[in-house]
């Protein structure tokens, strides 16, 4: 390819541009990107800026040519204003929303379970129209949650994300379907508003045009036209060209406007007496009044565009012209015409007549954070409007002020309800930084006003050509939500109407320019686009005579360069941020790439992060934009630093101290820790990373570890995706992670008295309390395990009749002898760790606590989890597996120089899954770890820049998606790797090495692929899953053990397991499993007694579930009873209940033990 080497150098360094102080990473990219990746949080941040009418947003809109930009809150206040009383003599209007300073910092809000919010004030103006008096006041409208710099909200101390929603845009949609009986094409159209009644027209199989108003019964369309004041002559004049409409007019027997109105009223309000006035009002209110009907700006834009009208965007109601033009479009569509006159432009202009594709991104828009919150504020204000109206009529006119009319409760409640309970306000995924970043860029078709999982069909879930560059075709969940939840593409942005735009380079007369145009999906359909990897020279001219171009609907064909209108800006334009971090994505099957993109979000932060040897160049941008690293705001010099803070003296003389997060718990129990990566006296530039966060190294995303991998079977121990690991990874803490759990207990006021946090706990030995301080709270640094007391607490017991002795004690010692029970906070069953923090909140110290709570204690327990059998590991290509065996390092296969491999993966995991990217990554990983030097100027190295001819060992590389290292380059580089100290190359040019069995020292018969692969430790840890039970809680009705680890349940012995037992003839074992080990209540106790006393196990009794079955049959009036040989009914009793109770009491067993709310109670 004739690309000059100079161009290539700029392409390699371009990946890192924009962020100063970036670590070295040599790139194999060949394409120069004319545009940097935009800020990945813009989707959230800019939308919220629009809502609050921020200065930066205002300036951005003015620069874009918007003369009078209006913020979201201002827009909704002007919609509701003025609120008039029923007589119209008084009105109240709102304007000028503004915020005060936030009440507390983000850290304080997280600490104290507060909401990060700012007080909202508006100017309210009350006007008395009879006297002309105007009273104006500034009114407090409640605390309004504010977005943090990272694009999240802190609600009651937890970090949440509001997900953007993909919905059908308001507008007019034409549809075509086939009638089942006649096989004729049937056409229909819906006018869908943002709020209000739907209006639907259709042409049925009898070729008559009908209308449905607000989804009620169908009637001829001419009835609606007559109701709007059209005469039969006017209809003939406008629609004379359409036989269908003329036939409909003939069949319509309504005479004049009045009769048509009454006809419509009867259909909409059956059972109510129709009058002309009420019918007229009803129709006007449905479609022509702003209070009841709103197309919204976007709906008006879509209607104008589709029907060729030229009405102002502010007109949110339907007009007569809208309805008439829609009917004309429908009948022309039915008649098979391809175009119709453009009534907006006039003259000879025409618009195409075609049906709409509802899954096209020109017809689906995003409701971003700002709009979702704005809708809730609108709901709250409309509830408040009712209150204001009532107060206007009831209060004394003289005494009325805006403050007395307004009740802000509905507004505050609506906002609170949205953030607390809406399906779109989600608990932020904080497993690692990429999980949080992806969560903020997520697009969901679910939620209020969207689709539901059950109703969504294949079409809406499928990848659509219009997704290109807008929504990632790869990153979506597996399971019921597939295709309904997506991720915004890397370069995409959202326009003011909510449509997603993607950038293209303009092509003029076959020459590619650096002019960037952002196009929406329907604008893009008019042009022909070329791929980003189309070869061009330094001037931007296409090198080939024929260029592959993409037309409407995703069709591709070879075209002359002059036919091309636009060109992609980047090869990674079509994928999301997470997918763009998979090297050699182009060599992976889509299903596996999907798993790879999703599993990166599940990687737990390791003790020591390590950036990938083989990356894509996206690591730095993703880490910086995710916001878990600390960046310098201004250029300057590091004045002072320690583990907890960094002080920068800026060039302008200002001093700024950055506080670092130390070992705090994330939403998902992983450890968040920031550490400085600069030294005192270092010079830093604005935007430079000065401290690493979790899963980052030198400011780059670092989710896993580079491990030396051999791809081979090993004694069957890595069969079916199992993984064999070296003991070295356990000893050296290579894959060790820290997990922090939060345990909390509160002391409340109960009916019997106040609970107390204390060290004085009844019936507990002193050695159990050894680690508690004098308050009864565990000391920091204590090692704890399941069942240990973290916080001592006692609760008053219910009073019983006192014996004379107790009364005497009470008289002598006062309240002290009162009965209390132990309700201490204990470590849950199966958990261990070290106490790293304790927080105490007390009402006496003026801490805000919920009503009835006097004291709240939080204990943080950290666990260091080494890698072990059963943990799940994965690569970035969907190659996941569970550790099957951990071998001593000396037993692992080793190369000729004696170095053992770290991990063995099975060869069978590659061919049928078609994720070959992992093999190329392994080879390039080896090349990067050894370094390389290219001799001469071989053919395969023609596209490599100068800086890639000689690279040191251990240099990080970047192989960007769709523009990475090629197969012939990897083959050439394998032969060019630098030799080790003995002058030997362990891995040959074919990427394989001679390995030796670590146990015998014998060489393996065939060479094995060896290299470095980036391996992630996923959050599916065996410690969280392993579970065992001896006795525990039972279900109330069936008396069978509960299920699941959270309930401390048993293992289900189901239908198929019973069949297996029957097949083996193991009758007694089966009987035991179904009775005394499960729900034979009496038998359980007797068996326990027999085991304790060393006796033989007695006969099983009747299972409780059998009794339940009998009761259910009795409820169906079927009497089931057991008869003796002489036909007498036998009562099913389980022997002597008194003996049973006595035995249970002696053994200390509680027979009435039913479901308990949590495992903690079970363990207690």
From Swiss-Prot:
The yes or no answer to whether the keyword Nucleotidyltransferase is present is: yes
Gene3D superfamilies in alphabetical order: 2.40.50.100, 2.40.50.150, 3.90.1100.10, DNA-directed RNA polymerase, beta subunit, external 1 domain, DNA-directed RNA polymerase, subunit 2, domain 6, RNA polymerase alpha subunit dimerisation domain, RNA polymerase Rpb2, domain 2
Protein keywords: DNA-directed RNA polymerase, Nucleotidyltransferase, Transcription, Transferase
Query: GO CC terms on record?
Result: DNA-directed RNA polymerase complex
Q: What would you give as a GO molecular function for this chain, any one?
A: DNA binding
Identify the EC number(s): 2.7.7.6
Gene Ontology process terms (BP)? DNA-templated transcription
Superkingdom as given in the UniProt entry: Bacteria
Q: Which Pfam families match?
A: RNA_pol_Rpb2_1, RNA_pol_Rpb2_2, RNA_pol_Rpb2_3, RNA_pol_Rpb2_45, RNA_pol_Rpb2_6, RNA_pol_Rpb2_7
Name the reaction it catalyses: RNA(n) + a ribonucleoside 5'-triphosphate = RNA(n+1) + diphosphate
Q: What HAMAP family does the database record attribute to this sequence?
A: RNApol_bact_RpoB
Recorded hits in PANTHER family, A to Z, give: DNA-DIRECTED RNA POLYMERASE I SUBUNIT 2
The UniProt entry's sequence similarity note says: Belongs to the RNA polymerase beta chain family.
How does the annotation summarize its subunit structure? The RNAP catalytic core consists of 2 alpha, 1 beta, 1 beta' and 1 omega subunit. When a sigma factor is associated with the core the holoenzyme is formed, which can initiate transcription.
The record's NCBIfam families line, in alphabetical order, gives: PRK00405.1, rpoB
User: What job does this protein perform?
Assistant: DNA-dependent RNA polymerase catalyzes the transcription of DNA into RNA using the four ribonucleoside triphosphates as substrates.
Indicate what this protein is called per its UniProt record.
Answer: DNA-directed RNA polymerase subunit beta
> From which source organism is this entry?
Saccharopolyspora erythraea (strain ATCC 11635 / DSM 40517 / JCM 4748 / NBRC 13426 / NCIMB 8594 / NRRL 2338)
Q: Which gene encodes it?
A: rpoB
């Amino acid at each position: 390819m004739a690309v000059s080497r100079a161009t290539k150098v700029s392409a390699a360094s371009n990946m890192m541009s924009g962020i100063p102080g970036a670590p070295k990473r040599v790139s194999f990219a060949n394409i120069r990107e004319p545009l940097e990746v935009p800020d990945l949080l813009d989707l959230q941040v800019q939308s919220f800026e629009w809502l609050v009418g921020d200065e930066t947003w205002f300036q951005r809109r003015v620069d874009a040519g918007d003369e009078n930009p209006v913020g979201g809150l201002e827009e909704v206040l002007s919609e509701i204003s003025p609120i008039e009383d029923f007589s119209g003599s008084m009105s109240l209007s709102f304007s000028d929303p503004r915020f005060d300073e936030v009440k507390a910092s983000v850290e304080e809000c997280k600490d104290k379970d507060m909401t990060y919010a700012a007080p909202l004030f508006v100017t309210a103006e009350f006007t008395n129209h009879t006297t002309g008096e105007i009273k104006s006041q500034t009114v407090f409208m409640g605390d309004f949650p504010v977005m943090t710099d990272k694009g999240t909200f802190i609600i009651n101390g937890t970090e949440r994300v509001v997900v953007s929603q993909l919905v059908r845009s308001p507008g007019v949609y034409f549809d075509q379907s086939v009638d089942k009986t006649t096989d004729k094409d049937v056409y229909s159209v819906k006018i869908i508003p943002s709020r209000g009644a739907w209006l639907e027209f259709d042409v049925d199989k009898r070729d008559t045009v009908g209308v449905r108003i607000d989804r009620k019964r169908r009637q001829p369309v001419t009835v609606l036209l007559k109701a709007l004041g059209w005469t039969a002559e006017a209809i003939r004049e406008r629609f004379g060209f359409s036989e269908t409409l003329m036939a409909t007019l003939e069949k319509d027997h309504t005479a004049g406007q009045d009769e048509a109105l009454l006809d419509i009223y009867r259909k909409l309000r059956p059972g109510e007496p129709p009058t002309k006035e009420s019918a007229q009002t009803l129709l006007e209110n449905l479609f022509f009044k702003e209070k009841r009907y709103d197309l919204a700006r976007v709906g008006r834009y879509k209607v104008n565009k589709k029907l060729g009208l030229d009405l102002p965007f502010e007109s949110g109601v339907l007009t007569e012209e809208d309805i008439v033009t829609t009917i004309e479009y429908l009948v022309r569509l039915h008649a098979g015409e391809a175009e119709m006159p453009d009534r907006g432009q006039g003259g000879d202009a025409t618009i195409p007549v075609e049906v709409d594709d509802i899954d096209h991104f020109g017809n689906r828009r995003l409701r971003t954070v700002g709009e979702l919150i704005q809708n809730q504020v609108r709901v709250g204000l409309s509830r408040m409007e009712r209150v204001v109206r009532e107060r206007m009529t009831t209060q004394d006119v003289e005494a009325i002020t805006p403050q007395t009319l307004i009740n802000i409760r509905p507004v505050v409640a609506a906002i609170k309800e949205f953030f607390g309970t809406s399906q779109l306000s989600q608990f932020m995924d904080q497993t690692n930084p990429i999980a949080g970043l992806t969560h903020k860029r997520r697009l969901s078709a679910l939620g209020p006003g969207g689709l539901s999982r059950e109703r969504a069909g294949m079409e809406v879930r499928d990848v659509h050509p219009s997704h290109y560059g807008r929504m990632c075709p790869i990153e979506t969940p597996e399971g019921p939500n597939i295709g309904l939840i997506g991720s915004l593409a890397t370069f995409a942005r959202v326009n003011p109407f909510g449509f997603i735009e993607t950038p293209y380079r303009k092509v003029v007369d076959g020459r590619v320019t650096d002019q960037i145009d952002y196009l929406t999906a329907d604008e893009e359909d008019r042009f022909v686009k070329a791929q980003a990897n189309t070869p061009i020279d330094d001037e931007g001219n296409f090198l080939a005579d024929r260029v592959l171009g993409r037309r409407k609907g995703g069709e591709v064909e070879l075209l002359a360069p002059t036919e091309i209108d636009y060109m992609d800006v980047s090869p990674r334009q079509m994928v999301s941020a997470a997918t763009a971090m998979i090297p050699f994505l182009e060599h992976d099957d889509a299903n596996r790439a999907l798993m790879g993109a999703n599993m990166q979000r599940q990687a737990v932060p390791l003790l020591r992060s390590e950036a990938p040897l083989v990356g894509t160049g996206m690591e730095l941008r993703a880490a910086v934009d995710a916001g878990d690293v600390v960046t310098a705001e201004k250029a300057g010099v590091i004045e002072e630093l320690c583990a907890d803070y960094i002080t920068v003296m800026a060039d302008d003389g200002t001093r700024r101290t950055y506080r670092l997060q130390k070992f705090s718990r994330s939403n998902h129990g992983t450890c968040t820790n920031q550490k400085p990566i600069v030294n005192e006296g270092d010079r830093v530039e604005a935007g430079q990373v000065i401290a690493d966060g979790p899963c980052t190294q030198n400011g780059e995303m670092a989710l896993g570890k580079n491990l030396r991998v051999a791809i081979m079977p090993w004694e069957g121990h890595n069969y079916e995706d199992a993984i064999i690991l070296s003991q070295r990874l356990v000893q050296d803490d290579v894959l060790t992670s820290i997990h922090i759990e939060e345990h909390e207990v509160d002391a409340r006021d109960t009916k019997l008295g106040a609970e107390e946090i204390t060290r004085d706990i009844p019936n507990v030995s002193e050695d159990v309390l050894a680690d508690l301080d004098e308050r009864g709270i565990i000391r920091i640094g204590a090692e704890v395990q399941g069942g240990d007391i973290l916080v001592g607490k006692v609760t008053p017991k219910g009073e019983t009749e006192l014996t004379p002795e107790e009364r005497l004690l009470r008289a002598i010692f006062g309240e002290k002898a009162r009965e209390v029970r132990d309700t201490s906070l204990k470590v849950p069953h199966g958990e261990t760790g070290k106490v790293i923090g304790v927080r105490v909140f007390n009402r006496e110290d003026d801490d805000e606590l919920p009503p009835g709570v006097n004291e709240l204690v939080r204990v943080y327990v950290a666990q260091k989890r080494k890698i072990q059998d059963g943990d799940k590991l994965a690569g970035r290509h969907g190659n996941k597996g569970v550790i099957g065996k951990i071998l001593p390092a000396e037993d692992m296969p080793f190369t000729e120089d004696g170095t053992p491999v770290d991990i063995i993966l099975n060869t069978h995991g590659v061919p049928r899954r078609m994720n070959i990217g992992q093999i190329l990554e392994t080879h390039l990983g080896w090349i990067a770890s050894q370094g390389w030097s290219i001799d001469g100027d071989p053919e395969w190295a023609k596209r490599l820049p100068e800086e890639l001819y000689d690279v040191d060992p251990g240099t990080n590389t970047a192989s960007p998606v769709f523009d990475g290292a090629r197969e012939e380059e990897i083959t050439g580089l394998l032969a060019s790797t630098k030799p080790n100290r003995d002058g030997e190359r362990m891995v040959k040019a074919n990427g394989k090495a001679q390995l030796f069995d670590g146990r015998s020292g014998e060489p393996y018969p065939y060479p094995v692929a060896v290299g470095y692969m980036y391996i992630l430790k996923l959050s599916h840890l065996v410690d969280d899953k392993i579970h065992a039970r001896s006795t525990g809680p039972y279900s109330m009705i069936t008396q069978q053990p509960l299920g699941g680890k959270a309930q401390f349940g048993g293992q289900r012995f189901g239908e198929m397991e019973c069949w297996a037992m029957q097949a083996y003839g193991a009758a007694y074992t089966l009987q035991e499993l179904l009775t005394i080990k499960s729900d034979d209540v009496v038998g359980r106790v007797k068996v326990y007694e027999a085991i304790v006393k060393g006796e033989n196990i007695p006969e099983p009794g009747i299972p409780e579930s059998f009794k339940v079955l009998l009761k259910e049959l009795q409820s169906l009036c079927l009497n089931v009873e057991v008869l003796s040989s002489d036909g007498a009914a036998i009562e099913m009793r389980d022997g002597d209940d008194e003996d049973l109770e006595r035995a249970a009491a002696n053994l200390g067993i509680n027979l009435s033990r039913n479901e308990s709310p949590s495992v903690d109670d079970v363990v207690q």
